[in-house]
């Protein structure tokens, strides 16, 4: 990813996080790398992580060839929904961190919705 492209993504992410902070609800944040996918649920003020899931965890890795495809994103989405609900979080704002709502990001969001999270 070029520097300018990454700076633009971070600028979009900053704007989105500002709007989410004004809503006052928990935030489901996604980080995408070339090899893995990470998801975290933060408190409404962003000071504490309530739940987390990623493709490095053993329960997600089982049965996957790699952690960078949509199948892995679906597993992470279901797992983050399960963990957030166990922590008492039902409603979240989806923070895609400036990434396009497409591919792995969309697969994770759809799986989290199916898991019971409301965006």
Curated annotation (Swiss-Prot):
One Gene Ontology biological process: translation
Known partners and oligomeric status: Part of the 50S ribosomal subunit; part of the 5S rRNA/L5/L18/L25 subcomplex. Contacts the 5S and 23S rRNAs.
Gene Ontology molecular functions: 5S rRNA binding; structural constituent of ribosome
GO cellular component, one term: cytosolic large ribosomal subunit
Gene: rplR
Keyword terms: Ribonucleoprotein, Ribosomal protein, RNA-binding, rRNA-binding
Lineage start: Bacteria, Pseudomonadati, Pseudomonadota, Gammaproteobacteria, Lysobacterales
Coiled-coil region list: none
PANTHER family for the chain: 39S RIBOSOMAL PROTEIN L18, MITOCHONDRIAL, LARGE RIBOSOMAL SUBUNIT PROTEIN UL18M
Species, as recorded: Xanthomonas oryzae pv. oryzae (strain PXO99A)
Role played: This is one of the proteins that bind and probably mediate the attachment of the 5S RNA into the large ribosomal subunit, where it forms part of the central protuberance.
CDD domains registered for this protein in UniProt: Ribosomal_L18_L5e (cd00432)
NCBIfam families: L18_bact (TIGR00060)
Entry similarity comment: Belongs to the universal ribosomal protein uL18 family.
HAMAP family: Ribosomal_uL18_B
Domain of life per record: Bacteria
UniProt protein name: Large ribosomal subunit protein uL18
Record-linked Gene3D superfamilies: 3.30.420.100
């Amino acid at each position: 990813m070029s520097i300018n492209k990454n700076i633009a993504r971070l600028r979009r992410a900053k704007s989105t996080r500002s709007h989410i902070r004004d809503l006052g609800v928990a935030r489901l944040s996604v980080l995408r790398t070339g090899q893995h996918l990470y998801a975290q649920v933060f408190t409404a003020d962003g000071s504490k992580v309530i739940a987390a899931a990623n493709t490095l965890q053993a329960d997600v890795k089982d049965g996957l060839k790699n952690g960078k495809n949509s199948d892995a994103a679906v597993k992470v989405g279901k797992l983050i929904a399960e963990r957030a609900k166990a922590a008492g979080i039902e409603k979240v704002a989806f923070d895609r961190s400036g990434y396009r709502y497409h591919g792995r990001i969309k697969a994770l969001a759809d799986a989290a919705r199916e898991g019971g999270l409301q965006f």
